[in-house]
């Protein structure tokens, strides 16, 4: 991956993260606690991916 690809992947992941947060808010509002837990786990995975990508970006 070159620097531009890493930057694009970070931007794309940030958009997905924001969308996922909105989905969690909707699930909480509608009382779907079980689905909220799964969605929060996906957020944690996204956070880990962001850490890895930011580390790669720092290496450039």
Set out the residue ranges of the language-model regions.
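Short, charge/polar-rich alpha-helical segments
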Residues: 1-15
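Short acidic DE-rich linear segments
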Residues: 2-4, 37, 55-60
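Amphipathic alpha-helical coiled-coil segments
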Residues: 17-24, 42-60
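Short, charged, amphipathic alpha-helical segments
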Residues: 7-11, 33-45
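Conserved short acidic donor-positioning loop in nucleotide-sugar-dependent glycosyltransferases
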Residues: 30
